Structures are given as structure tokens and as C-alpha cells.
């Protein structure tokens, strides 16, 4: 039913416990997931993560029969200076997330692009350097576990919240193995253009999140919590641009939406999956020529 490179994030069903969410996703016909491990966003993975919790989560995932493309996690504000004890705790949490990624067969761990604040802790340049250094360190640790390290940048609610700041971080990461996760909703909410994002970051894009959004206006902030088709994201143009650069990575419906009820959510997810599958399969010019 769905394209083999299109998965569904467990965040799409964050109101359900993990086993139920995975059963729902599998029942819709998806074969691949992103595993949400974001405190305050999705509780499918305990924030206090120890070896026992890692084994428990991995067992639930294995039982589902679903492939895991990435674990979407957080180890705290990467642009915040920590004391020795806090650094040790962050390192321990990173190790547990990497262990979870490895035990679930994930290709990568995804980390954010800074704190949930547009204002830097110090200078913008200094904060970007700190975030970059932390991500590069995490990517080196990831190698020990046989997985990759990606960052979701830009992210509308974090330090690297627009295209310009995402570019600054990408520049800082030049020469590293850190991949970039492209999220249509965050790009649009920030006033950016998905096609421009693809042209800027090209083959550094390793994964794509799919959700709709509208940009900020004079009277309100951007809204990233819209079902596909209910916002202003040009998925046809963005996916066509990815195809044009030879993108061979995967896509994930991360439908953290607030415009449908929980009862409506499975049908809305299936509808989005069919729509995106068609766009992945057929070039934009083919769709336009048929209209």
C-alpha cells in the first residue's frame, strides 16, 4: 500500500502506549517506524533510561515486527555548559539511547539542534560551535554502537530555528559524519522553502520528516501541528527536489497533529501515506502533466 521507503513515526500515535501504537501502525500497513524518545513530546521511551528499560523497549519493538529507521531522542540542551556531574549524566543517557538504537536495529540516533529557545545562552557563534562539537562527539560515540548520528536542523522551536541558523550549524558540521534530518513542517513554519532547503543541504540530508504547517504571521507564530494537506507545505515540489538530487534515504510521517481527533488519527495517517506514496513514486512533472 505504501512506498517501501515511507515509514511512520511512533510520535504519530503518542497518545497510545508503545505496544498499542506499534500495533496501530502495523495494522495500517506500514513496515517501518521512527521511534519517538522525546521527553514531553512522546513517552514511548522512558526518559530515565537504563539497561533494563532499553531491553524492555527493544523487546516491544521486536515483537511488533516493524523495522526501525531512527530513534528520535534528546540528551538535553546541547548549547548549555554543564558541570562535571551533568556531563557524565548526559554521556550516560547518550550511551543508553545509542544502545537502544543498536538493539532495535535502527540506522541512526537523531538529536536536536540546540535548546528549545531561539535566544543563545551566550553568543550565537559560540552556541553554534558548542552544539556542533556536541553533535560531532555524539557521532563518534555512535560509531562504537554501529549506528549513525543525525540532527534535526532546522527545528522551529530550537536554537537553529530557521534556514540561516541551520546553515551556520551545517557549516560547523562540515567534514563530520553528522547527517541532517529535513522536516517539512519546521521549514515552512519558519518561513522557509523546502526546495531551497534541499538545494542548500543536498546530499547531507539523510532522513525526511513529513507533516504540514503554516508560517508565522503578524498576529501569531507558525503552526507545525497540521495534517498533510491542511497547511502550506509544497510536498510535491519538495519531494521532486529530493528526487532531482538523487536522494535515496527514507521518509517518515511524523504526524504530531492537533487538527484531528484521536479516533480520526488512523484514517488521517493512512490518507497521508497514500498521498505521499504517490509523490515519491511519480515525478512532479508527471503529476502536473496529468492534471
Task: Name every feature range the model reports, one short phrase each.
Residues 1-7, 14-31, 62, 90, ...:
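Histidine-acidic metal/acid-base catalytic patches
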Residues 1-7, 69-80, 113-118, 217:
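N-terminal small/glycine-rich loop or linker at the start of catalytic domains
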Residues 12-14, 37-39, 74-77, 113-117, ...:
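Active-site-proximal loop/turn and secondary-structure-junction residues that shape catalytic pockets
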Residues 43-49, 84-87, 125-126, 222-228:
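Short glycine-enriched, charge-decorated loop/helix-capping segments at active-site entrances
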Residues 40-45, 77-82, 117-122, 189, ...:
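A short acidic, helix-capping loop that chelates divalent metal ions and anchors anionic groups
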Residues 34, 70, 110, 150, ...:
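Conserved beta-strand positions in the central sheet of alpha/beta enzyme cores
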Residues 36-58, 113-119:
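Glycine-rich, proline-tolerant flexible connector loops at the mouths of alpha/beta enzymes
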